[in-house]
């Protein structure tokens, strides 16, 4: 469940000031202060700090309280200081140093607070301290603080900020060379830039060193070599190796290990081994780092056995594996399904006295999660804590990712809460995992996670928006997907192939092929190269729309653009031809596929078998099936189900059961469609007892029935009671009219008779099915029976099914009550139903009830932009309910909702044209 976050201040349009814009203004003001030492005032960093996010609304009260405490003697013994120390943040310290504080006290306090294990200075707190010290004429200690500031960089932004500040100090003539950068400072700065891969900035700093006539040393050159090698740019790195020799210096082990790393980054292992083998010849001992780089390179290339051989040879070279060496191998073995070998290495590691570190444990936890061994993963997390190792964000993310991939979102949320309870903040990756997980079942909850990200000032990235766009598209919310695309652009994020692939694929699946084609045609102008997935989606879309000729033209266009089709592309066309009854052409296309070097897949055979069976050509269909087996192409559940469905349709249940037996013999598990086909087959023959036997087999194998399975069983029970219905009335409508609660009770009793005890999932699917056919009266009775007689609490899916059914039947008061009940138990109502409900209430003149429902939705943690999109713009706005549009907009503003600039503009423009 998405928990409600406190409403934010509404500022209408939102925006941010670029860090670079702020940096440009950094030293724009001079203030001269009289002093016994001749000096000029150094500009405060406070303008920059004002643009940084504050951690608390009362962040300025903390610095003033600190100033009051520090102005007294023996301040370090103050009980008030000790009571507030855990709440002091770097932003508070930055603000404190910008106040009228004695510089010596500031230095002492800086040292005192840094002794607190929970506190870490930021580059901004150090910058504020530097400003204070420089303005008071300090020199020697400034060099020390500047080095500490450089070393404290935690991000690219920090590194660029520090670089700009150091340049200002270095070039400001007012300081009369007192604060010029010396070799140690230059090297530390290079090291900081190298950590974040800022090689262009490193090169500029190197050139500035030369301009300042500061002579580079071996450490300088090695940092340059290492910086380029981290990015795999060995050519540029080798230029600095040449400079080492030109300077009369000798490359050392750091130089060579960097080169080995660089070649491994480029996957040029031959060159890496060449450097490795030359090291002893150059009088340079090969160390553990060199070995580990090579072992890592071999592992990345999936040459794990060679990596293990090199690992064994380390001891012959009097080198001993480090924790990183072991971890690299353990990770690779885990990723190659060689987990027993990985565990043996962990055991060997501990026996040799090398303790696994956080990264080692993270690798093992990730591996256990990939095997769905979550209990063992949690045990390992506990072991870490017992051994005094504090899991980091990456460790928790491994668990969160594992849970989300298996649809266990609530467990993932529990891990996030555990992580936060240990003073670790979720990062972009954490939220991205949650968003991906929620998108599989409830995109509105995923949007709520985006809301939380923005609240906490965690920046969404391309992956965030791609996942949300994909989720909205899969839910059929294309308007929301397009708006997210615009928001993405507004935030300076560039949509990539994945963004558009998802949209094009979903549009095609929703039979909006022309719209998908228009989007596809716009990609060249956007600088995005169409890929095989996009072409395949369009080809499949045209085929499913019965436009096989257009699909062929798209294939030709694909080939003309040198985009090679894959087996999925051909399968889409073969399926289109088969659906059109053109089996001969489909077979010829299969032959063409083989000629260009693409082997037919299981899906290819299954598509052709399906057509043969549809044409009644059982012999050729079975012959192709046998060819699959003899050629080593293993038929899948879909292949077997194709036969079973056809046999059931023909009333040949013995043949269907025979195919089920073959399926099990060949190690293929029947799926939902397989069992449902058999249930329908027996039901159509009036053999309902056999149908319930199949339901029992289904449950025993762990395959949960769907709502359609239960509808099928209800249909057969009704047919036994009333006979088969004839006439023009659609089957679902007929079932809805005939179904009574007694029929559902009979179904439940039959389930118990056949040892299929109804559980929460059974009731959930049953209610979903009954709501789908529009029988709200029976659905409500089953809903009550489930709670009162079985003690089962309704799931969010059940509530939303009832809500949707109420809305479709225009029972708005009942729908409003369902919304109230959902919110009361912490469930999230589907926005599409809420849109229909609120519009319905306003149209009936019940605007107070409509406003009340909307007010309640604001407390649920939805992404506020999405609420505005779905309810106000696409709901009451497009329905021509102008008064409701402005009323609901006003409600959001009064509740402190904060919109993106794009959404705010749409709201200001007023209701869109009515449709």
From Swiss-Prot:
It comes from Arabidopsis thaliana. It holds the Pfam family PPR_2. This is Pentatricopeptide repeat-containing protein At5g65560. PPR repeats lie at residues 182-216, 217-251, 252-286, 287-321, 322-356, 357-391, 392-426, 427-460, 461-495, 496-530, 531-565, 566-600, 601-635, 636-670, 671-705, 724-758, 759-794, 795-829, 830-864, 865-899. Keywords: Repeat. Transmembrane segments: none annotated. It comes from the Eukaryota. SUPFAM superfamilies: HCP-like (SSF81901). InterPro entries: Pentatricopeptide_rpt, PPR_P_subfamily, TPR-like_helical_dom_sf. Belongs to the PPR family. P subfamily.
């Amino acid at each position: 469940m998405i928990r409600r976050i406190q409403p934010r201040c509404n500022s209408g349009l939102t925006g941010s000031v670029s860090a670079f814009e702020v940096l440009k203004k950094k030293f724009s003001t001079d203030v001269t202060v009289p002093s016994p030492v001749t000096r000029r005032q150094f500009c405060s960093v406070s303008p920059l700090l004002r643009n940084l996010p504050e951690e608390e609304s009362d962040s300025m009260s903390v610095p003033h309280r600190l100033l009051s405490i520090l102005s007294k003697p023996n301040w370090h013994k103050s009980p008030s200081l000790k009571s507030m120390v855990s709440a002091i943040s770097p932003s508070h310290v930055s603000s404190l140093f910008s106040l009228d504080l004695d510089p010596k006290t500031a230095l002492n306090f800086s040292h005192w607070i840094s002794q607190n294990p929970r506190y870490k200075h930021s580059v901004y707190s150090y910058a504020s301290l530097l400003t204070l010290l420089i303005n008071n004429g300090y020199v020697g200690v400034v060099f020390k603080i500047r080095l500490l500031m450089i070393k404290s960089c935690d991000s690219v932004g920090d590194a660029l900020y520090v670089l700009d500040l150091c340049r200002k100090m270095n070039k400001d003539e007012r300081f009369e060379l007192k604060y010029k950068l010396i070799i140690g400072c230059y090297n530390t700065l290079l090291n900081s830039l190298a950590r974040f891969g800022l090689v262009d900035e490193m090169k500029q700093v190197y050139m500035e060193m030369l301009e300042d006539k500061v002579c580079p040393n071996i450490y300088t050159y090695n940092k340059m070599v290492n910086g380029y090698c981290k990015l795999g740019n060995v050519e540029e790195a080798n230029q600095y190796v040449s400079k080492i020799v030109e300077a009369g210096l000798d490359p050392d082990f750091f130089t060579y290990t960097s080169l080995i790393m660089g070649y491994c980054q480029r996957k040029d292992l031959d060159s890496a081994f060449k450097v490795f083998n030359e090291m002893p010849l150059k009088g340079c001992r090969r160390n553990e780092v060199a070995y580990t780089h090579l072992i890592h390179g071999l592992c990345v290339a999936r040459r794990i056995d060679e990596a293990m051989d090199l690992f064994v040879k380390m001891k012959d070279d009097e080198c001993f594996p480090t924790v990183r060496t072991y971890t690299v191998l353990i990770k690779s073995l885990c990723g190659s399904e060689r987990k027993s070998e990985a565990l043996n290495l962990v055991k060997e590691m501990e026996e040799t006295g090398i303790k696994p570190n956080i990264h080692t444990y993270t690798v093992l936890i990730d591996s256990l999660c990939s095997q769905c061994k979550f209990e063992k993963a949690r045990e390992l997390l506990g072991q870490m804590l017992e051994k005094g190792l504090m899991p980091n964000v990456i460790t928790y993310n491994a668990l969160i990712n594992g849970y989300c991939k298996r649809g266990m979102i609530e467990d993932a949320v529990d891990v996030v809460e555990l992580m936060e309870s240990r003073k670790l903040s979720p990062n972009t990756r954490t939220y991205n995992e949650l968003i991906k997980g929620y998108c599989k079942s409830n995109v509105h909850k995923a949007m709520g996670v985006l809301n939380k990200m923005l609240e906490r000032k965690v920046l969404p990235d391309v992956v965030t928006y791609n996942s949300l766009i994909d989720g909205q598209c899969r839910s059929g919310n294309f308007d929301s997907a397009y708006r997210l695309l615009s928001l993405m652009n507004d935030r300076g994020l560039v949509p990539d192939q994945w963004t558009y692939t998802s949209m094009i694929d979903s549009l095609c699946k929703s039979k909006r092929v022309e719209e998908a084609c228009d989007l596809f045609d716009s990609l060249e102008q956007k600088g995005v190269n169409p890929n095989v997935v996009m072409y395949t989606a369009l080809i499949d879309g045209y085929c499913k729309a019965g436009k096989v000729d257009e699909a062929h033209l798209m294939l030709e266009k694909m080939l003309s653009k040198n985009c090679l089709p894959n087996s999925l592309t051909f399968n889409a066309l073969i399926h289109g031809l088969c659906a059109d009854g053109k089996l001969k052409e489909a077979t010829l296309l299969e032959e063409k596929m083989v000629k260009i070097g693409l082997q037919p897949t299981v899906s290819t055979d299954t598509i052709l078998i399906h057509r043969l069976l549809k044409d009644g050509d059982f012999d050729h269909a079975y012959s192709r099936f046998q060819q699959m087996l003899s050629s080593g192409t293993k038929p899948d559940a879909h292949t077997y189900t194709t036969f079973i469905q056809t046999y059931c349709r023909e009333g040949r249940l013995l043949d269907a059961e025979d195919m089920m037996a073959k399926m099990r013999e060949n190690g293929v598990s029947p799926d939902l469609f397989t069992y449902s086909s058999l249930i329908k087959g027996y039901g159509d023959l009036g053999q309902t007892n056999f149908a319930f036997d199949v339901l029992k087999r289904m449950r025993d194998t762990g395959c949960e029935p769907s709502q359609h399975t239960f509808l099928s069983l209800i249909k057969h029970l009704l047919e036994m009671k009333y006979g088969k219905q004839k006439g023009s009335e659609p089957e679902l409508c007929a079932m809805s009219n005939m179904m009574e609660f007694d029929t559902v009770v009979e179904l439940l009793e039959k389930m118990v008779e056949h040892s299929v005890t109804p559980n929460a999932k059974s009731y959930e699917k049953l209610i979903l099915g009954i709501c789908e056919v529009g029988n709200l009266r029976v659905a409500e009775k089953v809903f009550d029976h489930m709670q009162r007689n079985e003690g089962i609490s309704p799931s969010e899916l059940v509530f939303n099914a009832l809500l949707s059914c109420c809305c479709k039947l225009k029972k708005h008061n009942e729908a409003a009550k369902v919304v109230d009940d959902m919110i009361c138990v912490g469930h999230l109502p589907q926005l599409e139903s809420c849109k229909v409900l609120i519009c319905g209430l306003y149209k009936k003149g019940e605007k107070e009830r409509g406003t009340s429902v909307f007010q309640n939705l604001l407390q649920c943690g939805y992404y506020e932009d999405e609420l505005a999109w779905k309810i106000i713009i696409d709901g009451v706005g497009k329905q021509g309910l102008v008064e409701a549009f402005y009323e609901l907009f006003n409600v959001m503003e009064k509740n402190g909702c904060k919109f993106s600039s794009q959404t705010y503009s749409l709201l200001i423009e007023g209701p869109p044209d009515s449709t």
